[in-house]
A protein has these predicted regions:
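TOPRIM fold recognition
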Residues: 2-5, 125, 197-198
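Cleft-lining beta-strand/loop regions that shape enzyme active-site pockets
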Residues: 17, 21-131, 135
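Intrinsic disorder/low-complexity segments enriched in polar/small residues
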Residues: 7-9, 29, 196-199
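Charged, glycine-interspersed solvent-exposed loop segments at helix/strand-loop junctions
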Residues: 63, 130-199
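Acidic/proline-rich low-complexity IDRs
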Residues: 10, 14, 35, 39-41, ...
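Intrinsically disordered, low-complexity segments enriched in small/flexible residues
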Residues: 1-21
Length: 199
């Protein structure tokens, strides 16, 4: 892992590990570029990223997230999604490659979404397992299913319709391609719901 150097802003010029990389661009306006091109890992691997997002200087006006992730852990997805969604500086998301599962959900965490040519999002239900005694297993499955539904609803609607959300919960995958006719309508509906005109 590279050792970052400090500068007058208190941010690092470069910061990276196996899960992400950050670069700081200095013009008159500071922009932060973040690249996530691996699976979404467990949240402890993003502690420096979280710290960076919490300590952005006042003259930083944009965070650019470049995303090409093939999925990963929900335990890492939730804090990552929240870090971008509620960042004090607006986050613009650029999908640069295929994004599956947790990667697709992370694409909806910013203030805007741009899908580059030949890219795709694939949404599907979560997978996992439980172990324990009989009633504990039952409770874990019931509460886990309820929690997953709530997380999915909060993250993917209204980009995905309620019918598509129900499909996800019943293991029907949903694919969104960069050139499909309704993509811009989905983006407006999700990121600018007040501006979406109902017909």
């Amino acid at each position: 892992m590279a050792t970052p150097t400090e500068n007058e802003t208190g941010l690092n010029d470069a910061l990276e590990n196996e899960s992400f990389s950050i670069s700081i661009r200095r013009d008159e306006i500071i922009a932060v570029d973040i690249t996530l091109s691996t699976e979404v890992n467990l949240s402890f691997q993003y502690e420096k990223l979280f710290a960076t997002l919490r300590s952005l200087p006042q003259n930083c006006t944009t965070v650019n997230l470049f995303l090409a992730s093939f999925g990963g852990y929900m335990q890492g997805l939730v804090p990552l999604f929240n870090a971008f969604k509620y960042c004090q500086v607006p986050v613009d998301v650029y999908v640069t490659g295929e994004c599956y599962s947790a990667g697709a959900m992370l694409a909806l965490s910013g203030r805007s979404l741009t899908m580059m040519p030949n890219t795709m999002l694939m949404f599907h239900n979560s997978s996992g397992g439980e172990f324990g005694k009989g009633n504990e297993l039952y409770d874990a499955v019931m509460h886990g299913t309820k929690h997953t539904r709530g997380v999915f609803k909060n993250m993917v609607t209204p980009f995905l319709s309620n019918a598509e959300l129900e499909g996800l919960m019943h293991d029907k995958d949903t694919y969104i391609h960069w050139d499909q006719p309704d993509l811009q309508k989905r983006i407006r509906r999700h990121f600018n719901p007040k501006k979406e005109v109902k017909k």
